[in-house]
UniProtKB/Swiss-Prot annotation:
InterPro entries in UniProt: Hwtx-2-like (IPR012625)
Species in which this protein is naturally found: Aphonopelma sp.
Cell compartment(s), UniProt: Secreted
Taxonomy of the source species: Eukaryota, Metazoa, Ecdysozoa, Arthropoda, Chelicerata
Tissue expression remark: Expressed by the venom gland.
One Pfam assignment: Toxin_20
Protein name: Omega-theraphotoxin-Asp1a
Protein family per UniProt: Belongs to the neurotoxin 12 (Hwtx-2) family. 06 (TXP1) subfamily.
Signal sequence coordinates: none
Keywords for the protein's UniProt record, in alphabetical order: Calcium channel impairing toxin, Disulfide bond, Ion channel impairing toxin, Neurotoxin, Secreted, Toxin, Voltage-gated calcium channel impairing toxin
GO molecular function: calcium channel regulator activity; toxin activity
Main location: secreted
Function: Toxin that inhibits voltage-gated calcium channels in rat cerebellar granule cells (IC(50)<200 nM). Is lethal to cockroaches.
GO cellular component, one term: extracellular region
Source superkingdom: Eukaryota
């Protein structure tokens, strides 16, 4: 896994990567390719 360089508005299962749709991939979120994972 790596810190997402794209904004965390990538969606998984039709829902925002982060609950409030924040643009930063901080707070435990990591993106792998186009998958958003909370770690």
């Amino acid at each position: 896994l790596f810190e997402c360089v794209l904004s965390c508005d990538i969606k998984k299962n039709g829902k925002p990567c982060k609950p409030k749709g924040e643009k930063k991939c901080s707070g435990g979120w990591r993106c792998k390719i186009n998958f958003c994972l909370k770690v």
